[in-house]
């Protein structure tokens, strides 16, 4: 069996420690050697990003320049249509073949809305889900049929992610950082410091570009 590949999607507007540090911990916990970051172009589930795709891509490049764990996949940025995880995972599965273990990393908040995602039922056909826990969010789905779906696919053994190509959901005990892109944008608009919230090269670039003012 080939090594587990993990994908991490998001808007990253801007990228910050709340994105990077939990995933770095996750990698150590379950034995990931590479995490591919996939920034959205037009996210279908949330407001449009304030920074454009070129700026968000550059901030990510700055953030991961000294972090060999991470690599960047630009495919969604090159689409002129909404970015759907189901579509991206189908492409990855076709490129990697049927036997490579593949996982998609999401937050616990995203798990609760997961049944509203485009073609959500196909996602586990192509990948595992790794859920980073977050305080204040329930561990149960809102509807009984979705709770059953969760329980049917749930595993408590991260080794299962390495041994099967897709189909499992793993709830990871990752640290939670009280950081969000919204908080960072509000701080910047108010002229407050963000030095402790995101990598220094990213903050320097934000100031150079006059972003989030």
Curated annotation (Swiss-Prot):
Gene3D superfamilies: HUPs (3.40.50.620). It comes from the Bacteria. GO terms for biological process: 'de novo' NAD biosynthetic process from L-aspartate; NAD biosynthetic process; NAD biosynthetic process via the salvage pathway. Pfam families: CTP_transf_like. Coiled coil: none annotated. It catalyses: nicotinate beta-D-ribonucleotide + ATP + H(+) = deamido-NAD(+) + diphosphate. Pathway: Cofactor biosynthesis; NAD(+) biosynthesis; deamido-NAD(+) from nicotinate D-ribonucleotide: step 1/1. Its EC number is 2.7.7.18. GO terms for molecular function: ATP binding; nicotinamide-nucleotide adenylyltransferase activity; nicotinate-nucleotide adenylyltransferase activity. Activity is susceptible to product inhibition. Keywords: ATP-binding, NAD, Nucleotide-binding, Nucleotidyltransferase, Pyridine nucleotide biosynthesis, Transferase. Catalyzes the reversible adenylation of nicotinate mononucleotide (NaMN) to nicotinic acid adenine dinucleotide (NaAD). Belongs to the NadD family. NCBIfam families: cyt_tran_rel, nicotinate (nicotinamide) nucleotide adenylyltransferase, PRK00071.1-1, PRK00071.1-3. This is Nicotinate-nucleotide adenylyltransferase.
């Amino acid at each position: 069996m080939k090594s587990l590949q993990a994908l991490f999607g998001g808007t990253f507007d801007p990228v910050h420690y709340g994105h990077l540090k939990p995933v770095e911990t996750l990698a150590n916990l379950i034995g990931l050697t590479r995490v591919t970051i996939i920034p959205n172009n037009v996210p279908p589930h949330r407001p449009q990003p304030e920074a454009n795709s070129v700026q968000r891509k550059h901030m990510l490049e700055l953030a991961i320049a000294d972090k060999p764990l991470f690599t960047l996949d630009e495919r969604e940025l090159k689409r002129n249509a909404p970015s759907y995880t189901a579509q991206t995972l189908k492409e990855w599965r076709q490129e990697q073949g049927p036997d490579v273990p593949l996982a998609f990393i999401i937050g616990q908040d995203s798990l609760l809305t997961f049944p509203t995602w485009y073609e959500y039922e196909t996602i586990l056909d192509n990948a595992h889900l790794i859920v980073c826990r977050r305080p204040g969010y329930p561990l149960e789905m809102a509807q009984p049929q979705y709770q059953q779906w969760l329980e049917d696919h749930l595993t408590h053994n991260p080794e299962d992610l390495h041994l099967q190509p897709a189909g499992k959901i793993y709830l990871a005990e990752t640290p939670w950082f009280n950081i969000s892109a919204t908080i960072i944008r509000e701080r910047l608009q108010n002229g407050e410091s963000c030095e402790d919230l995101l990598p220094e090269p990213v903050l320097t670039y934000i100031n150079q570009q006059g972003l989030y003012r």
